[in-house]
Amino acid sequence: MESTIDLSELLGRVRKNMKLLIILPLLGLLISAIISFFFLDVKYQASTQILVNQKGNDSQIMAQEVQSNIQLVNTYSEIVKSPRILDKVSKELDDKYSRSEISSMLTVTNQAESQVLNIDVESKSGSNSEKIANKIAEVFSDEVPDIMNVDNVSVLSTADNTGKQVAPKPMVNLVVGLVIGLVIALLIIFIKEVFDKRIKTEEEVENELVIPVLGSIQKFD
């Protein structure tokens, strides 16, 4: 006969393993804290924006150029990451960072149907992230007229005072560690209860054998 576990019995088994439910989540919390504060590199991100916009007075011409500029944004996002731009950025930063290093720090994004390019730079220093982002925007806006034969780029906003820590995120990591510890504890309890076939109580004897218990023998040391 298959035995069923009611809610009170389930809660009883959980209470029986309360030490495990406390120790493993706390252990996960401790491990996450150690990793977050001592092993993960701190990263700061700074952002600047580039506007792709041809100056003009005729409204009809401007409307056409807006669509043209939007189509060019994807091309410009690739130009920002090109060796021509990044090599010059590296040179103007006194070769403190190589082209590949700058490329690994750089992320270029834009919203759909937008003329704005977002340039994000991540490094181990907020001030360095700001400096590199500003230099990329400056070099790009200077080089585009020569590359594309059109002067339709301007710096919309600089990266000054935008540097902020983006990694690690200790609170998120601590919560994740706590949850992982709790899940592991519950899995251990579940596996232990499923594979432990021993009969431990009078109720389990009655449920398993469907006969009344006449008496019990106490354990002697």
UniProtKB/Swiss-Prot annotation:
Q: What keywords would UniProt list here?
A: Capsule biogenesis/degradation, Cell membrane, Exopolysaccharide synthesis, Membrane, Transmembrane, Transmembrane helix
Highest taxon listed in the record's lineage: Bacteria
User: Where does the UniProt annotation locate this protein?
Assistant: Cell membrane
Instruction: Kindly tell me the pathway this chain contributes to.
Output: Capsule biogenesis; capsule polysaccharide biosynthesis
GO cellular component terms, alphabetically, are: plasma membrane
Biological processes, Gene Ontology terms: capsule polysaccharide biosynthetic process; polysaccharide transport
Is Hydrolase set as a keyword in this record?
Answer: no
> How is the protein disposed in the membrane?
Multi-pass membrane protein
Where is the chain membrane-spanning? 20-40, 171-191
Recorded GO molecular functions are:
carbohydrate:proton symporter activity; protein tyrosine kinase activity
* One Pfam family it belongs to: Wzz
Predominant subcellular localization, coarse grouping: membrane
Q: Show the InterPro entries listed in the entry.
A: Bact_polysacc_biosynth/exp (IPR050445), CpsC-like (IPR005701), LPS_length_determ_N_term (IPR003856)
Functional summary from the UniProt entry: Required for the biosynthesis of type 1 capsular polysaccharide.
Family per record? Belongs to the CpsC/CapA family.
The protein's name = Capsular polysaccharide biosynthesis protein CapA
Native species: Staphylococcus aureus
State the encoding gene. capA
